[in-house]
Amino acid sequence: MKESVIRKLEGLLERNEEVLALLSDATVISDQDRFRGLSKEYSQLEDVVSSFKAFQQAQKDFDYAKEMLEEDDLEMREMAQDEYKQSKQVLEKLEDELQVLLLPTDPNDDTNAFLEIRAGAGGDEAAIFAGDLYRMYSRYCEANRWQMEVMNVNEGEHGGFKEIIVKISGDGAYGKLKFESGGHRVQRVPETESQGRVHTSACTVVVLHEVPEAEAISINAADLKVDTFRASGAGGQHVNKTDSAIRITHIPSGIIVECQDQRSQHKNRAQAMSVLAARIQAVEDEKRRSAEETTRRSLVASGDRSERIRTYNYPQGRVSDHRINLTLYRLNEVMEGDLNVLLDPIMLEHQADMLAALADD
């Protein structure tokens, strides 16, 4: 292992001991915010520190076995040979483990997420497919015991959604779903198609992380244009008689957010502001990532969120993820919410990219 990596690990070991000491300090214990922050840091350091301690012991065992190979006694050398092979395997395994643990983590992975699904090309069929995607994500959320809350919905005339925005609350929601951002294409025969021709439709999916109030970008009220209107259901039927729905336009960026799911204008405004904060933060995050990764391949399109990432082919029962050239004939399982068969390989590929970048550095 590189000397620079060893030094970094030794620094983390020292920091772990420092945090542990602080957690037993009465002054820190009385400051709940600081105590909570240090507890989180300690839990984040725990795995890498534990592995590094095991690595240090394995290194000692390996060095000792190597010395024993120089012994004059034949029996001792034979014993050392076995120990040498075994300790070398353990050392290599722990080295690989530490490299993965040292990969930079997205601080937003543990946050809640906003999921936005919009019908694209394909008219009514695209809206119906947006409904199918919503159902797929709903099943996945149920399996993970995450809560879903509809923020805004614009129903399709013949089923599905022209647009639906939901908040997903649960541990690791954003970290799991963030790779879903992009264009999703469906190939199938619509129910209204009398001649059995396969049609192609598309939807775009955007996944944003929730921005905690304490970390939210400051939004100047003077930069906002707020409109109220009556919330409406499918086909334009009014569901209440008051102007409870909210449309907020952030003038500098041109970002527009609507929220009409709650009966209270106050609640709709609060939800719209949280979505607006997430979208503005996403724009800022994108700028930062683009600056940092101008020469690095990204699994999710860096600028164009509509770039096609996946195709769902119903006649063949096939789903293909174009970012990693993965094709599975398990469409029914995926549409029932078994998304891990797609998400796990993408995460592994992303991890491999980061390891390669680490090696280059």
Swiss-Prot record:
Record note on modification: Methylated by PrmC. Methylation increases the termination efficiency of RF1.
Keyword Protein biosynthesis part of the UniProt annotation: yes
Position of the signal peptide: none
GO molecular function, one term: translation release factor activity, codon specific
Modification N5-methylglutamine occurs at: 237
Entry's localization field: Cytoplasm
Chain residue ranges for the region called Disordered: 285-305
Biased composition (Basic and acidic residues): 285-296
SMART domains: PCRF
Principal place of residence: cytoplasm
UniProt GO cellular component terms: cytoplasm
Record keywords: Cytoplasm, Methylation, Protein biosynthesis
Coiled coil: none
HAMAP family on file: Rel_fac_1 (MF_00093)
Function noted in UniProt: Peptide chain release factor 1 directs the termination of translation in response to the peptide chain termination codons UAG and UAA.
PANTHER family, alphabetized: LD18447P
UniProt similarity note: Belongs to the prokaryotic/mitochondrial release factor family.
Name of the featured protein: Peptide chain release factor 1
Organism of derivation: Shewanella frigidimarina (strain NCIMB 400)
